[in-house]
């Protein structure tokens, strides 16, 4: 395609002049997605979805396959980067009121659910000790569903316990779901460009827009370069920083790890699950911790879109961010006091942010009227 046509293609995307660095994470997510699909394909070529050979095949990839160690580490750490970017992307959407583009927000939340499912299936594939037990604990939550639970669990496992059929179907799902993510990402981007992205002020930016290229492309490239540098530094110097020590041992159904936990990016949801001493209640809280994002566009009552001029909401937002980190931290700790109490308080505060959002908006409107 000639240079002028490329310019015209990007020039057709007018964007607000005042969008900040927080708007760069969408393109970074696209880059992460591309990296995951490419490295995932080369890993799938050498991987064996069999409970007796899965762990050995990962060892084979790292030791014997040319640049296999690089592919495996890029894929594993790339997943962590993906989640760091998506959590910042969601936080920016909550802070600046991007959720008022309802279709874009709802498609994005669906993308998050698909991404979490894909990452969970991927975590099981190495068939290490923590992979096996995390899969056992999480899939067992289906049994909490009245009437259908046991049947659904047996169907998902492919038997009466996690075994070879479970690993095979998890591999199949881990392979196929990214294609759904790519399709939904395309829809997400199309829906975004229907109305155009918001800006930090939360105002209509139609009167003050600039072409996407060259301004935003270079801005995006800077952040992409920084992310790539960080990724390569971690891959080169700290490749096992996000790994669980238990996962370096092959899965053993007869030995339970002292403390079962999923990957770090699920710990906030796992912490909420553990904070409720009831199986069904915990499973519902776990589901609601993600699903509650779907309610945000419909509970916005403030006349201001962005939190930039809403000091009370800013305080609540940063309390929410701190709560997210606290739940993540408590989920890494044993189920004993004071961690159980801390996680219960933090879980309550997590949900209180979404509940008090409309009340705070209504109060702000009252204050502005007086």
From Swiss-Prot:
TM stretches of this protein: 25-45, 69-90, 105-125, 170-190, 218-238, 280-300, 312-332, 339-358
Annotated positions binding heme b b562: 75, 174
Cofactor(s) this protein requires: heme b
Physiological role: Component of the ubiquinol-cytochrome c reductase complex (complex III or cytochrome b-c1 complex) that is part of the mitochondrial respiratory chain. The b-c1 complex mediates electron transfer from ubiquinol to cytochrome c. Contributes to the generation of a proton gradient across the mitochondrial membrane that is then used for ATP synthesis.
GO cellular component: mitochondrial inner membrane; respiratory chain complex III
Main location: mitochondrion
Localization in the cell: Mitochondrion inner membrane
Family recorded in the similarity comment: Belongs to the cytochrome b family.
GO biological process, one term: mitochondrial electron transport, ubiquinol to cytochrome c
Miscellaneous: Heme 1 (or BL or b562) is low-potential and absorbs at about 562 nm, and heme 2 (or BH or b566) is high-potential and absorbs at about 566 nm.
Disulfide bond entries: none
Annotated binding of heme b b566, by residue: 89, 188
Cofactor note: Binds 2 heme b groups non-covalently.
Name assigned to this protein: Cytochrome b
Superkingdom per UniProt: Eukaryota
Annotated a ubiquinone binding sites: 193
InterPro entries reported for this sequence: Cyt_b/b6_C, Cyt_b/b6_C_sf, Cyt_b/b6_N, Cytb/b6-like_sf, Cytochrome_b, Cytochrome_b_C_euk/bac, Cytochrome_b_N_euk/bac, Di-haem_cyt_TM
């Amino acid at each position: 395609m000639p240079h002028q046509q490329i310019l015209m293609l990007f020039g057709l995307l007018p964007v607000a002049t005042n969008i900040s660095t927080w708007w760069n994470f969408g393109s970074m997510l696209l880059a992460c997605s591309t990296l995951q699909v490419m490295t995932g394909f080369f890993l799938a070529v050498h991987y064996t979805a069999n409970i007796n050979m899965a762990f050995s095949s990962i060892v084979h990839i790292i030791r014997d396959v040319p640049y296999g160690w690089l592919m495996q580490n890029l894929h594993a750490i790339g997943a962590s980067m993906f989640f760091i970017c998506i959590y910042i992307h969601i936080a920016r959407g909550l802070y600046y009121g991007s959720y008022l583009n309802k279709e874009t927000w709802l498609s994005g939340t669906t993308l998050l659910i698909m991404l979490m499912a894909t990452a969970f299936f991927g975590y099981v594939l190495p068939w290490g000790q923590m992979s096996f037990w995390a899969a056992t604990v999480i899939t067992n939550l289906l049994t909490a569903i009245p009437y259908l639970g046991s049947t659904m669990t047996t169907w998902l496992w492919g038997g009466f316990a996690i075994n070879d059929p479970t690993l095979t179907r998890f591999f199949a799902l881990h392979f196929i779901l990214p294609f759904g993510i790519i399709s939904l990402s395309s829809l997400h981007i199309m829906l975004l460009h229907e109305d155009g992205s918001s800006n930090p002020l939360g105002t209509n930016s139609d009167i003050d827009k600039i072409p996407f290229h060259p301004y935003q492309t270079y801005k995006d490239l800077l952040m992409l370069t920084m992310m790539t540098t960080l990724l390569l530094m971690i891959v080169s110097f700290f490749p096992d920083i996000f790994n669980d020590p238990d996962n370096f041992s092959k899965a053993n159904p007869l030995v339970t790890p002292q403390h079962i936990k999923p990957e770090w990016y699920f710990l906030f949801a796992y912490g909420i699950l553990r904070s409720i001493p009831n199986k069904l209640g915990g499973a519902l809280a776990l589901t609601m911790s993600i699903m509650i994002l779907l309610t945000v566009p419909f509970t916005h009552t403030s006349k201001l879109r962005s939190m930039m001029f809403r000091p009370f909401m800013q305080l609540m937002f940063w309390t929410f961010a701190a709560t997210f980190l606290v739940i993540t931290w408590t989920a890494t700790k044993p189920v004993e006091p004071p961690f159980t109490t801390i996680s219960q308080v933090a879980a309550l505060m997590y949900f209180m942010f979404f509940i008090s959002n409309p009340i705070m908006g209504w109060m702000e409107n009252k204050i502005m009227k007086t």
